[in-house]
Regions:
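C-terminal cap/loop subdomain of S1 sulfatases and analogous C-terminal strand-loop tails that border
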Residues: 100-108, 114, 134, 141-214, ...
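Short alpha-helical functional segments enriched in proximate histidine and acidic residues
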Residues: 77-84, 88, 151, 155, ...
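Phosphate-coordinating loops and pocket residues in cytosolic domains that bind phosphorylated ligands
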Residues: 19, 108, 171, 223-226
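Beta-strand elements within well-structured catalytic alpha/beta cores of enzymes
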Residues: 1, 67, 71-74, 78, ...
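Histidine-centered active-site microenvironments of extracellular/periplasmic hydrolases
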Residues: 8-9, 16, 83-134, 144
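Core domains of carbohydrate- and sulfate-ester-processing enzymes
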Residues: 6-55, 264-272
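Active-site rim elements
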Residues: 56-70, 113, 133-143, 155-160, ...
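Long, internal low-complexity/basic segments
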Residues: 43-62, 70, 74, 224-272
């Protein structure tokens, strides 16, 4: 699985990205100053390096180099598969979908890794290749991975499944842009991050909020959730919150910080 730590790839892919030639992500040292406490608790990853450490140690460029090398290695391997498909008897009846289960922070928000609900962790590639899609295009509208299965059903001309929570992306692929659409990511019980064409709104299980104007602040640096003029917008965004949240289970060996050691009962009591 690449790119995934440990970031191993053949040397030729590392050679594409000399550390001293790389442009590193932007970083705001006091980026967390306007965040609610719960956001800091969730984002804290004690096992992972911080951006400050990466700067002081001089390792930041090497970390980025390794990540980019793995991305290029994967890109080449995908090309091998697609070339084989094009030269096979199945090219006219095969659908290919490429996606990732999460993004990755490379120091932009103070640390490295995933496990947050900001854009670096929640944004992933999603690529469809199908005989029914004859136009190469890039679509800016945010969608959800829940939409992959309904889209495959649509592309395969199968009857829709009414139990699916997602929706087919075929209309979107055919240029029917929905400017009101919202995509949601949930991390931990009742912590939701949603995005539309202009804003990212985050609503935590204790009622804390973050709001970013992506047109003015695409790097999500300045939390404007406390601006009274945006209360109506936040109320409208909250209408998209899931009505059901599955209780989480404790005891996992993969718990990475104290926040996730709490039980569902403790969460519900905290909200009262």
């Amino acid at each position: 699985i690449r790119p995934h730590v440990p970031w191993y790839a053949p040397k030729q892919w590392f050679d594409l990205y000399p550390p001293d030639k790389l442009t590193l992500p932007s970083y705001l040292p006091n980026d967390w100053d306007d965040l609610p406490e719960i956001a800091k608790q969730i984002a804290f990853k004690g096992m992972m390096p911080t951006t400050d450490w990466a700067i002081e140690s001089g390792e930041w460029s090497k970390i980025v180099q390794a990540y980019l090398a793995c991305v290029s290695f994967v890109d080449q391997q995908v090309g091998v598969v697609l070339d084989a498909l094009e030269n096979s008897a199945y090219k006219d009846n095969t659908i290919v979908v490429l996606w990732s289960d999460h993004g990755y922070e490379l120091g932009e928000k103070g640390s490295f890794g995933k496990q947050t609900i900001w854009s670096e962790s929640t944004r992933v590639p999603l690529v469809f290749k199908s005989p029914k899609i004859d136009v190469q295009q890039s679509i800016p509208q945010a969608v959800e991975l829940l939409d992959v299965y309904p889209t495959l059903i649509d592309l395969a001309a199968l009857p829709p499944n009414p139990t699916n929570e997602g929706k087919s992306l075929l209309p979107l692929i055919n240029q029917q842009i929905d400017s009101t659409a919202v995509a949601i990511t949930t991390y931990g019980q009742n912590n939701h991050s949603m995005i539309n064409m202009q804003y990212r709104y985050i609503f935590y299980e204790n009622g804390a909020e973050e709001l970013y104007d992506l047109q003015k602040d695409p790097e999500e640096r300045y939390n404007i959730a406390n601006h009274e003029a945006l209360d109506v917008l936040k109320t409208d965004m909250r209408k998209n919150l899931p009505k059901i949240n599955v209780d989480w289970k404790v005891g996992s060996s993969h718990i990475i910080n104290d926040y996730f050691k709490r039980t569902s009962k403790q969460i519900k009591n905290q909200k009262k």
